[in-house]
Amino acid sequence: MNIYEVGPRDGLQSAAVKLSTEEKVQMIGLLHDAGLNKIEVGSFVHPQRVPNMADSEDVFREVSGLDCELGVLVPNKRGLDRAKSVGAKKFNIFLSPSETFNQNNLGADLKTIFSNYRSMLYGVPKEDIRVYVSHAFGCPIEGKTDTDTLSEMLSQCAILGDNVVLCDTVGTANTDDMKEVLELTSDIRSNWSLHLHHNYQRHEKIFDNVQVGYDYGITEFDSSIG
């Protein structure tokens, strides 16, 4: 079982309380000391869009000596170039079967996003790319994606990166939803992970979803420090 810790990025990017660069570096160091060997440490997005991630270059420089895998989110070519300039080697991208999500977060439709990522990641080793599939189990606006469309999308994701992460972005998936999507992965060659959000109205159910993932052979799960 592997844990991929996303707290310094996903946990902090929308937090009401902004941590200083020094506090982020300390957090990442403590996570490393606790035994976590895969940590997402920042997001190279435009600082006006996500102010809490504006210091990602500085954070990465300070933690780059840690003996663990350090991942960073890079939604576009500019972000990738910034990440490379400070020595980042592991790059995380995101997209969704939900076109509403794609337009709101990446400013393009799914077809264009795939094209942009293929161009942007040319020359980056596939094993260094992690692909987040947001709203993989359904979008609160658009509902569920039909299985044929989702299967084709997941196949394209598996071509982009060596690790594809299925995200229950709003924490509403149940065990049947999990099984329906995980069934699609059996014929697609990739390393699959799960990113399950906590929903306080059904907090006990998340462990049922973890068990389903484990039963389907998932051995890497995202976590986020509270």
Q: What is each of the regions a protein language model found here?
A:
Residues R49-V72, K111-R130, Q156-C157, M178-L194:
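Alpha-helix-loop-beta-strand connector modules within alpha/beta enzyme cores
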Residues Y4-V6, K89-S98, R130-S134, G217-G226:
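Non-cysteine beta-strand/loop elements that form the S-adenosyl-L-methionine
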